[in-house]
Amino acid sequence: MKAIEWRNNRLIILDQTLLPLEEKYLELNDYHAVAEAIKTLRIRGAPSIGVAAAYGIALGALSIETRYCSEFLPLYQQISAEIASTRPTAKNLFMAVERMDHVVASGTDVLQVKISLVDEALKIHREEEEASRKISTFGADLIQPGWTVLTHCNAGPLATAGYGTALGVIIAAHQQNKGISAFATETRPLLQGARLTALELKEAGVPFKLITDSMAGHFMKKGVINAVVVGADRIARNGDTANKIGTYSLAVLALAHGIPFYVAAPSSTFDKSIESGNDIVIEERKPEEITYLRGQRIAPENIDVANPAFDVTPANLIAAFITENGIIRRGE
């Protein structure tokens, strides 16, 4: 399965909302469709969102029918703003938008700017692929033979437009014949762990167990989990980390049981512009994601629902960050 591909000036994505029941690829021909795909999680995972955002902007720019910079620029700004507004938490999205904006700001010829935007999007994609490969290699060195590693949500190839970050670490350790196994949390409310991580672990041949989110503490107490590895959507300058809701709970549980808690993420996820997790905007998603399951209501009508998509794990709970540049341990 390939999450995202640029082909003949069209963006091809795998609709992740349908997995694992249906493998369906969508051809996105305009930036509005890309924006909608990001909002509705057809493409998801911070690195993949960044790549999709870059391609979406390139698609939009290619559709602008003018050769005059004075006419091109305001139309481009509308495109960039719409893509940037899709999801507020993932740093990779804003990194991609900033890089594409810089290409436009540096250009003087509309045709050349369009070519350069496509080139920049392809470059961002290549960089994310290479980063996840290196993260997987560095992270595998932390995993000891025979360990069982717990992961949360989905940070594999589907989420990263490459090899995977947290899940890439687990898969790489397995491929090194370390005899490891995994626990995957189902990840309510949208079940990315059950639908996507379980699928990727199965395809990679990694022995694993799927568990509900609330079972993690039980298995930590039993002593069968040796490490936790998760991905990230945004990391503040002090190391506070935003990731899928439930990550903070796992970090607290890991600390209570003396289990190392690792965050695997590319440098594009680190946000040096914010001091701490208090500055990270947490996306609030629609209540129907909790009150409905596969189109069927599972909760009473007319009730209040809170549905934050992410939480923030304080840096002091994180043993180390696994990046494409190596391991950054707590306090470094």
Curated annotation (Swiss-Prot):
Which amino acid positions bind substrate, per UniProt?
Answer: 44-46, 87, 192, 243-244
Has keyword Transmembrane helix? no
Entry's Gene Ontology molecular function annotations = S-methyl-5-thioribose-1-phosphate isomerase activity
- Name the record gives this protein: Methylthioribose-1-phosphate isomerase
The catalysed reaction is: 5-(methylsulfanyl)-alpha-D-ribose 1-phosphate = 5-(methylsulfanyl)-D-ribulose 1-phosphate
For this protein, the Enzyme Commission number is 5.3.1.23
Homology family: Belongs to the eIF-2B alpha/beta/delta subunits family. MtnA subfamily.
Question: Which residues, if any, are the signal sequence?
Answer: none
Q: Where is this site: Transition state stabilizer?
A: 153
| Upper classification of the organism | Bacteria, Bacillati, Chloroflexota, Dehalococcoidia, Dehalococcoidales
- The record's gene field reads mtnA
Ordered alphabetically, the record's keywords are:
Amino-acid biosynthesis, Isomerase, Methionine biosynthesis
GO annotation terms (biological process): L-methionine salvage from methylthioadenosine
Give a short account of what the protein does.
Catalyzes the interconversion of methylthioribose-1-phosphate (MTR-1-P) into methylthioribulose-1-phosphate (MTRu-1-P).
Q: In which pathway does it act?
A: Amino-acid biosynthesis; L-methionine biosynthesis via salvage pathway; L-methionine from S-methyl-5-thio-alpha-D-ribose 1-phosphate: step 1/6
Q: Where is the active site?
A: 233
Source species of the chain: Dehalococcoides mccartyi (strain CBDB1)
